[in-house]
């Protein structure tokens, strides 16, 4: 009984988290297809049947087969999405970073349009509805104002966490999908012949039919039915693939029934429509008047839940990108006790501004739909490329070849058909995609170039300075700087190579005497939840080479991990206790800590020129305007010193100067040479 209850609640949570985007597609897909026909007057029965066939088989091929049956198997320890997939295959080919960057940037950019189009489509259903004697919302401006307020409030509450309302998302989305199915069936029973659309024949015929005025470009609107498939894959880590397997048949059935119900309503009423200046939406038009207001209300709630899921998904996506060092460090907050509840202020307000600007710029859902979906086709194409690399080791060559050929072909066709969206506003999401991609490229390749160009002379072996550090630690002539000095740096675990500036900070800048020297390296792994450490004492009791291994979804709060390491080392008698005479904590065994963070600035004394200099400079600019490393490492309440040092890349050789004159020296001691 407990197992069944657990499965039920897991399925309910999945409905509230995973299917918001794809679940609200019935609000605008058929409406967009009507616009492709030139409006209501351009509709024919063959056109409607063909559209339904294309929508059905797009859902089957793209969502069910590609994502539910294939992509969900490509999980990274339970995590899904384009960055988790990249983490699985990044060691196979270096060039795989390119589809990962492009796909991730496009997915983030497309998210700026999704909340605007879903909420606007829902609120437009209120136009003309009278509450009392007066219509509540009568103009598109009023629709936009209501949508603006809803979206703004949604972004405002993110910092407080949404767990307090998140528990209701599952039951509400269950109600939503039941609503879709019921009123789809209500209309379907009047025109059961629309079930002919289950045959792909009618969809293929429509592509070449004179009834289709836009030709292959109709697929740009059809594609809107499956835009939420990528989000379905990305959210796997929140709910587990089993819950998606259990709930997708219900969700898919509800969507198909509603699309076919809209089609049945259109066929039944062909020639009887009264064309007005208002936007015609078959989703609302097919509802009985007695449930119309409820339909608008539940649609608005579903749109808000879809927007919330997208915002949360964006936080998760960025957290993964930061962990994989594809984006600069950003402060990640946890507004609730739930491990999965995160909040990234920079992303929240960037997304808020972009979404509200999209709403103000496009104004109507009709114009948003014309621009919507272009960027997500790029993401799906990039996911296919990464998936094919993953499948190489999992399936035979023939299956992988068929998979790659089929889905690359289909998605390229969808991409080409969506290109018309560029002139209708798709350029907005593409510009945002390019901006995000530029930041990613600068950060990732800037780091790679910096490491490649680093002067070999700037790296020294920590082992070579072991004796010097121990001598400094025991030198009674030098006052104690701190009991435990922690250098946040990078030590090669095989060669012990460390940046010279690290040791320069300890030895040359007024020697820093400490009882224990900690050299801490944070290593990010492809496993999302790796959490372990290794220690190399190098034959001493006071020099600790600490290597932290953290998954790309783990917090990098060094102070918390270090506390555990210290306790473990003292308990195992690896380092000496540091009893404190003056303390508020009786029995305290360790002294005080000070963390040193070294910040690099590009030195003018470098031979790097041209595009390399530009790339490194841009990378440092982004670093200086991203999250403070003190916040990133969770050291806000620790004693931290930030030291600025020059980043020396292939030092410029300065010619030696000729000595001409030294005037009036005093008491010069000359050395004689034999």
Curated annotation (Swiss-Prot):
Record's subcellular location: Cell membrane
GO annotations of cellular component type: plasma membrane
Pfam families per UniProt: K_trans, K_trans_C
GO molecular function: potassium ion transmembrane transporter activity; symporter activity
Residue intervals passing through the bilayer: 7-27, 52-72, 95-115, 145-165, 169-189, 204-224, 244-264, 291-311, 342-362, 368-388, 397-417, 425-445
Catalytic activity from the UniProt record: K(+)(in) + H(+)(in) = K(+)(out) + H(+)(out)
Coiled-coil intervals, chain numbering: none
InterPro entries: K+_transporter (IPR003855), K_trans_C (IPR053952), K_trans_N (IPR053951), Kup (IPR023051)
This protein's UniProt keywords: Cell membrane, Ion transport, Membrane, Potassium, Potassium transport, Symport, Transmembrane, Transmembrane helix, Transport
Chief location: membrane
Recorded topology in the membrane: Multi-pass membrane protein
Family: Belongs to the HAK/KUP transporter (TC 2.A.72) family.
Job description of the protein: Transport of potassium into the cell. Likely operates as a K(+):H(+) symporter.
Name the UniProt record assigns to this protein: Probable potassium transport system protein Kup
Organism from which the protein derives: Ligilactobacillus salivarius (strain UCC118)
Upper lineage: Bacteria, Bacillati, Bacillota, Bacilli, Lactobacillales
Gene: kup
């Amino acid at each position: 009984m407990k197992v069944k209850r657990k499965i039920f609640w897991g399925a309910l949570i999945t409905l509230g988290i995973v299917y918001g985007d794809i679940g609200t597609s019935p609000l605008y897909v058929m409406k967009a297809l009507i616009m492709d026909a030139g409006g209501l007057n351009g509709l024919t029965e063959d056109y409607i049947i063909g559209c339904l066939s294309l929508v059905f088989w797009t859902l089957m091929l793209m969502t069910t087969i590609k994502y539910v049956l294939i992509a969900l198997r490509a999980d990274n320890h339970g995590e899904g999405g384009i960055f988790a997939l990249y983490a699985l295959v990044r060691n196979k080919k270096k060039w795989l970073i390119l589809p990962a960057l492009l796909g991730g940037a496009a997915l983030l950019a497309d998210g700026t349009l999704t909340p605007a189009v879903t909420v606007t489509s829902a609120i437009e259903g209120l136009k003309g509805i009278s509450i009392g004697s007066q219509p509540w919302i009568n103009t598109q401006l009023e629709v936009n104002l209501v949508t603006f307020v809803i979206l703004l409030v949604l972004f405002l509450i993110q910092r407080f966490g949404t767990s307090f309302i998140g528990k209701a998302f599952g039951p509400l989305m269950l109600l939503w999908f039941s609503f879709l199915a019921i009123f789809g069936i209500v209309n379907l029973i009047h025109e059961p012949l629309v079930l002919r659309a289950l045959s792909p024949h009618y969809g293929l015929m429509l592509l070449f039919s004179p009834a289709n005025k836009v030709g292959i470009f109709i697929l740009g609107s059809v594609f809107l039915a499956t835009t939420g498939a990528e989000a379905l894959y990305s959210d796997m880590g929140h709910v587990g693939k089993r819950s998606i397997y259990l709930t997708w048949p219900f969700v898919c059935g509800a969507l198909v029934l509603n699309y076919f119900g809209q089609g049945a309503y259109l066929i039944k009423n062909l020639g009887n429509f009264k064309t007005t200046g208002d936007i015609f939406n078959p989703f609302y038009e097919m509802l009985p008047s007695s449930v119309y207001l409820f339909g608008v209300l539940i649609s608005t709630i579903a749109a808000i839940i879809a927007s919330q899921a997208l915002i949360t998904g964006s936080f998760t996506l960025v957290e993964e990108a930061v962990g994989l060092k594809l984006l600069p460090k950003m402060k990640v907050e946890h507004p609730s006790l739930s491990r999965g509840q995160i909040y990234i202020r920079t992303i929240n307000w960037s997304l808020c501004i972009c979404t509200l600007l999209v709403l103000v710029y496009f104004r109507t859902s009709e114009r948003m739909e014309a621009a919507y979906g272009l960027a997500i086709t790029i993401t799906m194409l990039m996911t296919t490329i990464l998936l094919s690399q993953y499948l190489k080791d999992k399936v035979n060559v023939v299956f992988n070849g068929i998979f790659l050929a089929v889905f690359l072909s289909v998605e390229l066709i969808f991409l080409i058909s969506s290109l018309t969206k560029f002139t209708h506003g798709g350029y907005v999401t593409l510009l945002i995609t390019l901006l995000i991609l530029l930041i990613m490229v600068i950060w990732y390749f800037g780091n790679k170039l910096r490491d490649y160009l680093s002067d070999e002379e700037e790296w020294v072996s920590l082992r070579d300075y072991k004796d010097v550090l121990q001598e400094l630690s025991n030198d009674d002539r030098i006052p104690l700087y701190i009991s435990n000095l922690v250098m946040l740096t990078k030590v090669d675990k095989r060669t012990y190579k460390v940046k010279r500036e690290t040791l320069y900070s300890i030895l040359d800048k007024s020697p820093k005497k400490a009882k224990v020297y900690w050299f801490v390296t944070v290593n990010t792994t492809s496993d999302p939840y790796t959490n372990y450490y290794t220690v190399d004492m190098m034959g001493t009791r006071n020099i600790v080479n600490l290597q932290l291994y953290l998954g790309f979804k783990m917090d990098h709060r060094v102070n918390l991990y270090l506390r555990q390491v210290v306790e473990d080392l003292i308990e195992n008698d690896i380092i000496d206790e540091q009893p404190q005479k003056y303390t508020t904590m009786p029995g305290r065994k360790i002294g005080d800590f000070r963390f040193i963070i070294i910040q690099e600035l590009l030195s003018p004394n470098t031979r790097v020129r041209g595009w390399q200099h530009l790339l490194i400079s841009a990378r440092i600019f982004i670093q200086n305007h991203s999250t403070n490393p003190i916040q990133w490492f969770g050291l806000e309440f620790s004693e931290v010193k930030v030291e600025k040092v020059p980043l020396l890349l292939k030092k410029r050789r300065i010619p030696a100067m000729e000595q001409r004159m030294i005037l009036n020296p005093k008491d010069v001691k000359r050395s004689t040479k034999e």
